[in-house]
C-alpha cells in the first residue's frame, strides 16, 4: 500500500509538472478557443517528442506489442501501456542521429501521465485499446491523411463503410484530449457531435470521410485537428514583413492581413491575443497566410487567373477505391504470429496478416502454424536480400504483396521440403493456392505485360544501385577507419615526442660526467678571465700614472727653461712627448673583455687601447711596454741631437746611437752619463773656473772626461729625468715578466 501511494504521488507530481509548464507558456491568453486548443496540444506533442513519430511507427509499435490482434474494447493496464510507449520511443532513438537523441524515460513518463489524466481520470489504472490507438494516432506526427486513413480502418467494416457507432466512440475518445488541456467547454463530447458530422442515411466511405474531415471548414467538434497540423507545418515559415502592432521586423508562423485596413498585418501572437492599433478593430475580417509570396509572384498569379490559364486546384487527397480489396484467408499458411516469437518484428514487416495495413483481424494461432510461422520468418531475409528495407515496409507491410508471399513460400519449399510437406491435405491446399495465383497472374498478364517489362529493368537497376551504394558505404567506412588509425598514430607520436621517456631521462652516466666537467671548466675559465681582466686594469692604471708624470715633467722643464738665465730657448726641452702608439707587430686577437674593463684608467691609455678591445692580454702588455720604450727613446734622441749641435768636444759615435741599451745606462756609469750631459750645457762651456774637481771618470766606451765642479748645475730637471729613465726600465722589465707568466698560465 505504501508503494502504491508513493507511485500515485509521483504520478500526480509529474502531471502537475506538465500542466505547470503548459501554463507558463501563457497560452490561456489566446482569445480563440480553436487556436488555444491547437497550441496546447502542440505543446504536449512536442514536450513528449511525439512530433518525431509518424503513424507508421505507431502501427509498428502496436504490432510488436500484439495490440493489432486484441479486441478494441479490451483494457490495458499501466505496465502494458508503458511497454507500448517504450517500444515507440526506443525505436525512435534508434532512428535519430547520435547528436539528436531524446530522453526516453522522460518522454515515456510524460506521455504516460498525460494519457492517464485524459482517459483514466478516476485512477483505475486501465485504458482501452481503442482509446490508446486513437490517442497515439491523433497526437503523433506525420500527414493528416495517413492518420485519418488509419482511424477510418478502425471504425469501418470489412466492406469499407463507416460504422456510426464506432465513429461515435471515436469522437468520445478523441475529444477527451481537448478536455485534458482544460478546453472541455469548447470541444467536449455531446450526443449531437456525430450527427453534426455525417448524415446517418448516407453511407460514408473512405473518400467521403477524408473529404469531410479535411474540408475547410471541418466539423465544429474537430476543427482543432486540421489546425494542429497546419500549426506544425508553418511553425518555421518566415515572413519578411513588419508587424503593425508589435513592430517586429519579421514574423514566424502564421501571418494575418486585415481585409479592411490598408496594409495592416499582424503576427500570430498579436492576432491570437487580440492586439489592435490605430483604426484597426478585432471585429475586422482577417485573412490567414501560411507562406510568403513576393510582389512579382503575386502579379504572376493575378495575370494567370485573369487569363484563365491557371492550373486547376489539386484535390485534397488522392481518390481511393470505395470497395477495399478483400484479403486472402491465409490463416492455414501464414497465421498471425504469436506474442512470444523472437522474429515478430521481421515477420510483421514482410508478411502482413491482411490486405490493409490498418485492418488486422485473424484467428488465434495453433502450434503447428506457429512453427510454420517461424520458418517463414527465417526464410524472409534470404528472399528479400538486396531489395532494401523500403521495399519490405511499403510493399509487404502496407499492400500485402502476393508475389512476396509466393516467393517466400517457394523459397521455403526449396530449402526445407520435408518440413513443409508433412501432410497431404496441406500439400493440396498449397497447390490450390499456387494454381489460384498462377491463374490470376495469367489473367492479368495481357494488361500488365508492359508494366512488368518496365518493372524488371527497374528492379535490376534498383538492385545494382543498392549494390553500388553498399560498396560505396564499405569504401567510405574503410577510408574512415584508415583515417582514424592515422590520427591515432599521429597522436601517439606527438605524445611520445612531447613527453620525455625514461630512456631519455636516464642518459649515459659518462656523458653526464663529461657535461659536469665541462661546466666546471667553464666556471674556472670565467674566474681566471675575471682575474686577468682585473690585473690588466691595474696595469693600465699604473701606465696612466707614468704618462701623467711624463707630461708633468715636460711642463716643469718648459717652465724652468723659460725662467733660468743660463738656459736658452734652443736648449729647453719644450717639444711635446709623443703619445704611445701601437706596435705594428701586434696582431689583434679575440677577447671576451668589453671596453668597460678599463674603467678608472685615464683617457690616454684608453685611447691607446681603444682599437684593440679584442686583443689578448699578452699582446696588450707587450704593446704598452713598446710604446713607453719608444716614447722615452724619442725623448733621449732629441736631447742628444740638440746637445750635439752645440758641443765642441768630440763625442764617441756609439754614445749617439738610438739603441735602447745606450740610452739606459747601467748603475756604474750613471755619474759619467750625467757628467757628459752637464759638460754639453752652454753654462758649463762658457762659465768660470770650477771650484771643485772630482777627478776623471771613465765611461763605458773608455773615453775619459772631466766632471764639472759646479754641483749646482745638476738641477731638478736632470735628476727627474734620471729617475724617470730608471723607472721606465724597471717597469718594462716588470711588464715583460708578468706577460711571460700569463703566457705560461694560459
Swiss-Prot record:
Under PROSITE patterns, the record lists: ZF_ZZ_1, ZF_ZZ_2
Observed effect of gene inactivation: Increases alpha-catulin protein in mdx muscle.
* ZnF ZZ-type span: 238-294
A Pfam cross-reference name: EF-hand_2
Q: Where is the signal peptide?
A: none
Task: Give a short account of what the protein does.
Answer: Involved in synapse maturation and required for normal muscle function.
Segments of this protein annotated with the region Disordered: 555-577, 646-667, 684-721
Query: Hey, what tissues is this thing expressed in?
Result: Expressed in skeletal muscle, heart, lung and brain. Sarcolemma and neuromuscular junction in skeletal muscle. Isoform 2 is restricted to the neuromuscular junction. Isoforms 5 and 6 are only expressed in muscle.
Q: Where in the cell is it found?
A: Cytoplasm; Synapse; Cell membrane
* PTM annotation, UniProt: Phosphorylation of isoform 2 on tyrosine kinase substrate domain present in the C-terminus.
GO molecular-function term, one example from the UniProt record: zinc ion binding
Locate the compositionally biased regions of type Low complexity.
Answer: 563-576
Q: SUPFAM superfamilies, per this entry? A: EF-hand, RING/U-box
Q: Name any GO cellular component annotation.
A: sarcolemma
UniProt lists the family membership as follows: Belongs to the dystrophin family. Dystrobrevin subfamily.
The chain's coiled-coil residues are: 458-557
Keyword field: Cell membrane, Coiled coil, Cytoplasm, Membrane, Metal-binding, Phosphoprotein, Synapse, Zinc, Zinc-finger
Binding, Zn(2+) 1: 243, 246, 267, 270
Q: Which residues carry this modification: Phosphoserine?
A: 666
* Recorded name of the encoding gene: Dtna
Show the segment(s) annotated as Interaction with MAGEE1. 1-288
Domains: entry comment? The coiled-coil domain mediates the interaction with dystrophin, alpha-catulin and utrophin.
Q: What is this protein called in UniProt?
A: Dystrobrevin alpha
Sites binding Zn(2+) 2 sit at 258, 261, 280, 284
Q: How does it assemble?
A: Interacts with dystrophin, utrophin and the syntrophins SNTA1, SNTB1, SNTB2, SNTG1 and SNTG2. Binds dystrobrevin binding protein 1. Interacts with MAGEE1. Interacts with Ctnnal1. The interaction is required for correct localization of both Ctnnal1 and Dtna.
Q: Where is this region: Syntrophin-binding region?
A: 397-447
